[in-house]
Every structure is written in C-alpha cells, then in structure tokens.
C-alpha cells in the first residue's frame, strides 16, 4: 500500500502514465464525459469529495505547466477560480468557452469526477516535466 500521495489506484495509474503535455481533467458532478474518455468517478455524495480536495491531491504528484478553464468561471464561480489560482500560482491559465472545454475532454487521458456541486468547477491539467 502507498504511504503518501494519491491512494486511489486508478488516479495514481493515470498520473504515473502522464507524459509531457498530456492532459488530465478533473470536474464537477454534472460535467458530461464524452464516450471513449476514461471516467474515474470519485463522487460519493454532494460535495464529497470536493473539486479542490481532488485537485490538491493530484497536484501532490503531477507537475502541471498549463491549465484550461471555462471562460464562464470568471463570472459564474469567481471563488473557485481564486481557489484554483492559489493552488497553481505560477501556472499559465488559458480560458475557453465551456462548450469547447467539454469537447476537449476527448483529448484527456481521463476525467476525474468529483462530488462538486458548483458551476464550472472543471479543469484540464497539462502535464509538465520535472527536469
């Protein structure tokens, strides 16, 4: 058994298999996942686990060089946007319409579904390198 970091075997395996510039997505309970995209469903109840709990856990093991967020988060969920920026202070942020973010899930290694119940709590993480 792992002592630290991600103990969910599916999430741990996805992160371990990431290469430079690969994408991993984390999102709220309502985000539709395209057919063919691996879905890792961690949601057990409303807000369990929260989006930020899962994001912070993934960030313990994943080097991120860029993130993609829905443009709508700026107006519809500014508190979550601030939480994300605090968790990833030196990472480039790209915004796109929510409809484009949903389409982009087809390019991710997996989508991790949380129990989050706030709008636009979805992110695509672009993997960096550690050297």
Swiss-Prot record:
Substrate binds at residues 28, 98, 120-122. Gene3D superfamilies: RbsD-like domain. SUPFAM superfamilies: RbsD-like. One of its GO terms (cellular component) is cytosol. Transmembrane segments: none annotated. Signal peptide: none annotated. The keyword Cytoplasm applies. Its EC number is 5.4.99.62. Belongs to the RbsD / FucU family. RbsD subfamily. Homodecamer. This is D-ribose pyranase. It comes from Limosilactobacillus reuteri (strain DSM 20016) (Lactobacillus reuteri).
